[in-house]
Structures are given as structure tokens and as C-alpha cells.
Amino acid sequence: MRKNSFDKVGVIGSGTMGSAIAQHFLMKGLEVVMVDINLETLKRGKATIGVFLSEAVERRVIKEDGKNEMLGRLHLSASYESLKNCSLVIEAVFEDLEVKRQVFIEAEKWVGPKCVLASNTSSFPISELAKPLSDPSRFLGVHYFYHAAKNKLVEIIPGRETSDETTEKLYEHYFLWDKIPIIVKDVPGFAVNRFFVPWLNEASRLLEEGFGSIASIDQLTREVFGLGAGPFALMNMTGIPIAMHASKTLSDHFGEFYSPSATLKRQVESRNDWDLESRRSGNLNGEVITDRLMAVTFGIASQIVSEGVCDPWETDLGARIGLRWPLGPFELMNRIGLSRSKKMVESLFSRWDMPLPDFLKEASGKKNILLDQVHAHRIGETGVIEICRPDQMNALDVLTVDQLSERFLEFQDDPGIKRIIFMGRGKAFVAGASVKFFLERIEADDYQGIDLFTQKGQTLFKRIAESKKPTMAYLDGMALGGGLEL
């Protein structure tokens, strides 16, 4: 098992995000120093943590004495000197480039040479934040999602000078800390916010143009995307000014399409939440609302992949975990069809003189977008096959078994590969066959599909067992059912 090499974490900032990040590390058994310039703000941050821990006691996630023990490991300080024994320091102050830089200049004076420094920024390039640091190789971005103690997604963003060792060390540890990290390129918006913020903004444009009311747009969006809350309700939850400022930051880098709508700006100026019951504003046009919100999602997700920010599977993973969407952008595209998806994007992007992303051009004529649930890595003469469904505990479904078979046969037939290792990403090796798959097939009365899936699995296991090349399962987490067979 991986060993935790971080024992004391510093969190700079005690607001909503800072206190939640501190809570996350407290719940994982670490000592935490929370630093802020104002002791009253620090006390409020600690009180907020106490409220959430009390809720965890009520839900029987932890016990009362466990809550007290956690709070006993939380230290409040208005001095950067208190960070001197920390092995990891995360900044979570408000989004101001110079303020954040000054925070790290001060922190670097006190921390040891091996301490990892990280920013929770959602807006600024990591390489820009790193400029004043004397050792930028130990600095990177770790972007949490609300609520940081509960939401499992963390985007890890290495800057230009971040060392591979720093990135890999934190990536490994976030799995140990019960998070699901994805490594993304250092661009504004990173991966998830790059398409999520324009999705929110487009909803306000649809309202502005009279295609629906707040209530009707929210309702239709919930139905189409399968969400618990629509874009206006989500902005109320996370803060409408955040959506506006994030839109402005994106527009500064990527162009006018990303600019906040006039309606969004006015709402921020009013200092009021959206009226979620409001049915005023034009006539409902469900087709326009659906097509444009999907087009924003599909188009920008395709830009992300075209630019090498991350791959389609990790983009979908980010949407499912970070935003709690049932399906990610590319899974949605596969569901409604690539041809229709492409037409939606072309229609929207042409209004803004934006080119069709290269990824969508290259996907033309294909039936589906290939989503890699199983990755293959070559390390010298060793082939490593990694199952990448951490949000599903790497449970086996039809696509996973098919891709496992393909990757195994590739290595089996490659004379340069002398041995093959199987491993699972996250906290499980393989938690058996997908229960969801069986329930869906039973509901569809498709027992033949279940039989075919079982046969595919047994064929794969037989090939592995009879392979003349040494095979090994690297167990770093649970293995159940089909995972034990594998």
C-alpha cells in the first residue's frame, strides 16, 4: 500500500473553500494549520468545520469523540511562521493574482525545502502564480470542487517548471486521501470549469434572448442533462459573482464567446440571487435551449481535448465526479449521436466566428467517440494495463472487458513485452462486475446480453491464465468477484 508521506498540512485562507479543504485533511487523519490574517475569520472557519462534522456525526459517518479528535488536530494562526513544519501548504484565498503571489512569497520564507506548495485557484495560470517563487519545481495547482470535503474530484495542474516528482507524489496521495485526481494542462479554466462556466453563461443568454424563463430553463436542463439542479439554481448555490468573474477570465484568454452576458452582469450588480420561481421572459423554446446548452458543452469539451488539456475519458470523469452529472460531455455525444452533436456545435460556433474544434473534425464519420476506460503503458519490457474507472471502483462492464481484452492481446502479441501487469486506478483493484450493467440488462429482459458478457469475461481470464508471459495483478485496494478472478 502507498504510505502517506505528508503529516502536517497548511491551509491559507479560512473561507468557504479553505475551511472545507482543512476539513478534508482532518477527516483523513492529518494535522492541519489554518492561516488567515483575521482571527475572527479563522474562528468562523473553525465553526463552519464544526457544523459539517456535527452533520457527519448525525449521519453516523463519524462518532462524537472522532469529531472532537479531529478538531483537536486543527490549529489556527495569523502568522505564516506556523507553516514551518508543514509538508504541504495549499492556498485558498480570494481570486486576486497579486494577493495570491504575495501569499506564496510569505509562505516560502517559512516552509522547509521539501514542502509542496499548491494553489486552489480556479482562474489563474499556475505558471503565472509561480513566477515570484525561488523554487517553482515544488509548486502546482490543486483545484477542489464544492464542497471540498465531500466532492471527490481534484484537478492537479502542473506549471511549466513543476517537477514530475511533485506532480506524481501529490497525484498518488490524493488517491490515498480518498479523492479522484485528474492531471490537466495549465490553461485558464483547466478542464471542468472551461465548459461548465460557459454552460452557466449560455443559460443566462437564453434568458436574455427570451427563449425561456429562469424556471423553465432550469427545469428543461434538469430533464435533458439528468441533473438535480439547473444552471440558475447552481449559480445561486456557488455564488453568481463567481460565474461572472470566471466568464470574464475565460473571455480574456479565449475570446468574446466566453464573455459574461449582460443579464449575468446585471444580476451580480443587483446582489440578489436568481428568482428560481420566475416564469417571466419570452416564450419557451425547448429545442433552442436544449441544442445550445448541449452545443456549449460538446463544443468546448472538444476544444479541451483538441488542445491536449486532458482526454475525453478524463473530461467525462471530471463532469461526473466534480459536477455530479450522470453522463460526461462525450458520453452524452455518444448517446445522441456524433452527427447531431457536430451540427449543434457548428450552428452555435458559427454565430461567434469560432472554428469547429479539430477533435470534432477528426470524429466525422465515426459511430462513437472511443472512451478509454483501460489504459496501456510501456515501461521497458513491461506492459502495464490500468483499469481507469475510479468513480465506479473499477467495476467491470462490457466496454471495460472489451478494452481489457484488446490491451492484453496487444501486449501478448508484442515480442518486445516480456511481462504484463494489471492494476486499478484509485482505491480499488476491481470491485467485481458492474451491478448497474446487470440491473439494466435484467430490466431490458436481455439475458442473452448478460450471458455474452460473462462469456467474454471468462475468455479473457482463460487467455491470461494460459499466457506464456508472466502476468501479475498489482493489488492496492479491494478486489471482489470478477476482480478476484482477474
Q: What residue spans do the PLM features occupy?
A:
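Glycine-rich phosphate-binding loop at the start of an alpha helix
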Residues: 18-19, 136, 432, 451-454, ...
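Short, active-site-adjacent cap segments at secondary-structure transitions
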Residues: 83, 124-125, 427-431, 480-481
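Active-site-proximal alpha-helical scaffold in enzymes
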Residues: 204, 484-486
